[in-house]
Every structure is written in C-alpha cells, then in structure tokens.
Amino acid sequence: MVVGAIAAFVLIPVRQELMPHSSPDLQPLEFGQLPPRPRISRAATLPAERSPKVRTLILYDHAGQWGWTGRLDATFTANLIGHFGSWKAQPASEYTGGELERYTATVYLGSLFGQRLPHALLDDVLSTQRPVIWVGYNIGELEDRAPDFRAQYGWRTSFLDRSPVATVRYKGASLTHWTHNDAGIMGYSSVDRSRARVLATAVRANGSTFPWAVRSRNLTYIGEMPFRYTSETDRVLAFDDLLFDALAPRARERHRALVRLEDINPVSDASQLRRAADYLHSKGIPFGFGVSPYYRDPQAHEDPPHELRLHNSPQVVAAIKYLERKGGVLVEHGYTHQWDGGSNPYDGQTGDDVEFYRVTESEDGQIHDVGPLPEDTVAWSEHRVVAANHEFAASGIAAPRIFEFPHYTASANAYRAVAHWFAVRWERSDYFPGLLGDSPVEYDHIEGQFFPYVVHDVYGSKVLPENLGSIAPSTWHTYKERLPADLVRAARANLVVRDGFASFYFHPFLALKYLKRTVEGIERLGYLFVSPASL
C-alpha cells in the first residue's frame, strides 16, 4: 500500500540564501476570529463527467481484526466512483435481497479471505442483468452457489497463485506489479475464451501468464485487491479504467495533463518563478502554483530571516502576480508548511515539514505517520486556512480557490476544515478507516491514494489528480532519484485510462531543463495540458 503521503513521493528541502526583509506590520489573525464560512455550491464543483443517474452499491468485508482493510478498500473505491456518480457503501453482511437492482452497478470488495456472504447477495449477483464487479477473495462462495458456474460463465477459479508477478498486461500496456506482494492472485482451473473475455493478464517472473481480470455476461472478476502496494505505473490503473465499462461505457477517449509549480513561499527566488512561468507561457501551457504565504524557521536552520510574511516580500508578491498574468492559477499550499512544535519530521522549516499531521523520522531515515497533532481540531485547521487567505489579501492577491495540503498529509479534521472553505483540492490524499461512518476514525491505519482522473472524495471535495509525482535529480534521505524519463514513463502507463490525466509538479529552484524534458515528453504522448481552473 502507499503508506502515508510522504512515502509516496519525493520531498526536496528548500535551500537558498536568504536576505533580510522588513519586519511584519500586519497583525496575525487571532485564533477564534473566523469569518463566516463561504457558501460553496457542491453541485457546481462535481466532476464534469459525473452523472446524477449513475448510482453504485459498494459492498465490503469488515469483520474481525483486519476489518479495517475492508473499510479502507471501500473508501478507495468510493473515491474513484466519485468520478462517475453517487454511491452507497455498506458491509456485505448487511445486504438485503433485491438491493442491487436499485443501482447502476454493484462492486463487491473481497478484502478478507473466508467470509461467508448472504445467500440473497449471491443469488442476486447470479440473476441480475446489471453490471457486477467482484474484486479479490470469496469468489468461491459465488461459484459454489451456482448450479453449474463453469457452464454459465465459462470459467472457474482454482487457488491463490503466489508466484512473483512483476507485470500485468492491459490494453497492450505492461503495468507494474510489486513482486514482493505475496498475497496472491486468484488462479483458474479453466477459462473458456469463447464465453469469457480475459481483460488483463498477470505475467509471472518466468514469463508464463494467467488471467488477472475476466468478464463474462455482466460479471467482471478481478483476482486480487488492486490497492495493495501501488505506484504511478501500477496495475491499479487497469481497475481505474475498468470502472468505465460499468459506469460510463460511452466515455470518449481523451488524455489531459496538469503541471504545478511547487513550494513557493516568501523567501523563494522570484527570478526562478518568472523563468518557469515564461517557459510554460511560451509553450501555451496553463499551470498551477502552490504558495505557503508565511515562512517559518523557528529552529534557525537557515540564515535570517527566520520568519517572513508574504506581504513583506514584495519581490515574491510581484512574481505571484506575474505568474497569474502568464496563465498560472494560485493554489493555497497550507499556511506555513511546517509545525512550530518541533521537527515534523525534518527541521521545522517551511517547505520541509508537515503542517497538519504529526510525522517523525527514525535514525535510519524512515518516515512514521504518528497521528493528529496535539492542537488538531476542525477549528484549529480552519484558523490556519483563513490566516493564509488573510495573508494573500494583505498582499493584494485574490484568495485561491484550490487547496493543497503540505506534503499531502493531514488529519480527518483538517480535511473537513478545508472542505468548509475550498470546494477543490489538487493532490494525493490520506484516508483512514471510519470515514464511511461505520466506525470511529482509526488513525493507526493511514493510507494514501492518488487518482488518474478528477474525483469527488469521501471528504466531500472535488480532487484534481496528481499521479506522476515530481522530479528529484538526486537521492535525498530515503527518497530515490526521479528524472523526467521516469515521469514520462508513468504518463505512458496512464494512457490505459480512457479519460485519464498525466499530472505532476515541479520545484522552480531546479534546473529548467527538467521541466522542459518532462513537459515535452508528456506532450509527445498525446496529452493536452489544461488549466486546473477549467476542471
């Protein structure tokens, strides 16, 4: 799984010479001084492709000590289905006869092995004409319930194949599969290809193959849970695309791209910002740019100043306005992009640390998501969001309409707070068991998810995708080098998603050649760069 947002992509610390600036003259917003929340029209910000007529029933396993995995799998699925329409998620054990006939399609998530499923559910799956997607375990329950499953569907499973699988072939592309994932993929005793279609194929290390996903009649079966150990080029993309067959079969093929300039703050080099904007504008490419408007370095790791507000950084303010004139869309990237309570996890400096969650680093460089900060409440998070908007206003900059969590890491309270002020986020996001309302939020199990298309997630927000990551010219801490060719390779894999994106971010302090190579490589694949404001 993608464990925690920081672990999912590379972080690059901001390191540059800082010059003294005038002391702040703006009084910070006092805690509790929250203005009325804005009125946000959720209907106006739903994904354009989303249809009110598309309703999906999500059924999941939830029993026992591993029940949290089923709740998370259902959350991930609900997020993806938020691209297409509405959904209802409930434990499979609570299914009542005839229920699936009220929905466009049904997805059953077999996260836990050996679950006994209601006969009413099995009988309805066997008799319905509506699309059913069955994922992972417990397919034997359905096979045994049918009088002659093989005769009806043309295939029959056998046992979990635990052979190392490095590739899943789908629509002519080779998608990656982590070879150390030993949970297994369901094997088959027989597949009659005259009656069953093999949609995707697992390739063992020795080159032999077996079906990864099959379809016959209205039933699609995927032989493993695709949310385990994912990456930007992973077989989860096949699942992301297969949802179209059930929920939007007439969707047209199109491939769009997004780019965002990242980690801008009051001590950024204005000339570097202008340089990146000039290149993108010269190519006719709209872009976003993420700004944290209050620079903090309470541990004094850099030369003075150790704090600087945006309105006291006239060169950066002018550069932000320049970016907007060149087609850039402002994104609020937190307030300070750090935490004053200590290293979180690195050095307490803006751009390096997490703002809305407690994170630590062990001696061997491993990152650990600890849990909510001591201050964590919806009101505390709202205060920081409003304080950032206050700082933009003091700088003569219109408040942004898109939010991005620093290092893509936050508590459930923080996500709820942001949803009160922003209809749209642009990021990868963290999710927890309990967000479906079936249990309290469980912070012991934090998992990240990124999307190949625009979704409406369980926090109630539209989420624009960031699914390629960023450029890292060299290894930093435990994070490996990542070059333009790696991002372009990921963009190529994402072409299997019929209405998917190639979305990445770029730190302007890096050499411009990296941005050029990435943009031009993505364009050569046929992607069209669009403005985040258009979504």
Model-predicted segments: where are they?
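Aromatic-Pro/Gly-enriched surface loop or interdomain linker
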Residues: A8-R102, E253, L280, F289
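Catalytic grooves of carbohydrate-active enzymes
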Residues: R256-P266, A270, A379-I402, Y408, ...
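Catalytic domains of cell-wall/extracellular-matrix polysaccharide-remodeling enzymes
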Residues: H368-V455, L510-L515
